[in-house]
């Protein structure tokens, strides 16, 4: 079966994004739609561990070529950062139970992959051309806090700053977040999202997690004896 893929172009056409609808987190941005598609395809192998952790290795291996099902204009974030920041046509309305549970399983696999990479990469990360960039712990803190203190608000969750940065706090956040995703889909959360939708929230959470996981992999200095 082809991989349903969406192209999202920035309003000023400075950057574009290509992402998979059915595999949350498999998303890449580039200077053009064509390059975004090429980059997305090149990351197929890098997404494979996530599918494996989700128990979907066979399904992912059988996935066919990328098939564009929507070509849309995104938001300013698409131009500025090369990321998708709004839901596609396919990500509207409530999710079916099977669809929701599949997406949640893949999100949990993204978390597990993130945790595994964070545990094995070097504390110091390779710097950029001008010597800038974050170390591993700053990447971890940013990834966790953005999800737990920002994204989770979309489904009615509020936690103290930094509360998810401890092992117990992170485990509790993830458990409560999953409960909240299910509750929102069931209509049990009174305050509804304005511009986001539940499928987009799950996809965006997965993308943000994987984007920084791959960043840590790419900047890992372990092979060079990094501390």
PLM features: residue spans?
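Short hydrophobic/aromatic-rich motifs at helix boundaries and adjacent loops
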Residues: 83-88, 121-122, 148-151, 184
């Amino acid at each position: 079966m082809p991989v349903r893929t969406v192209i999202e172009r920035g309003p000023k056409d400075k950057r574009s994004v290509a992402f998979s609808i059915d595999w949350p987190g498999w998303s890449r941005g580039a200077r053009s739609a064509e390059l975004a598609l090429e980059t997305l395809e090149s990351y197929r192998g890098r997404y494979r561990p996530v599918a494996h952790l989700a128990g979907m290795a066979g399904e992912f291996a059988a996935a066919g070529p990328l098939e564009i099902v929507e070509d849309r204009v995104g938001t300013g974030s698409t131009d500025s950062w090369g990321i998708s920041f709004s839901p596609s046509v396919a990500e509207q309305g409530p999710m079916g139970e099977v669809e929701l549970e599949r997406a949640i399983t893949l999100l949990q696999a993204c978390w597990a992959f993130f945790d595994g990479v964070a545990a094995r990469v070097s504390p110091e990360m390779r710097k950029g051309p001008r010597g800038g960039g974050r170390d591993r712990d700053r990447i971890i803190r940013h990834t966790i806090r953005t999800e737990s203190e920002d994204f989770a608000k979309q489904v009615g969750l509020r936690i103290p700053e930094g509360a998810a940065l401890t092992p117990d706090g992170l485990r509790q956040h993830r458990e409560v977040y999953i409960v909240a995703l299910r509750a929102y889909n069931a209509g049990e959360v009174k305050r509804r999202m304005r511009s986001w939708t539940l499928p987009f929230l799950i996809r965006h959470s997965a993308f943000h997690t994987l984007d920084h996981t791959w960043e840590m992999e790419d900047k890992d200095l372990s092979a060079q004896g990094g501390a």
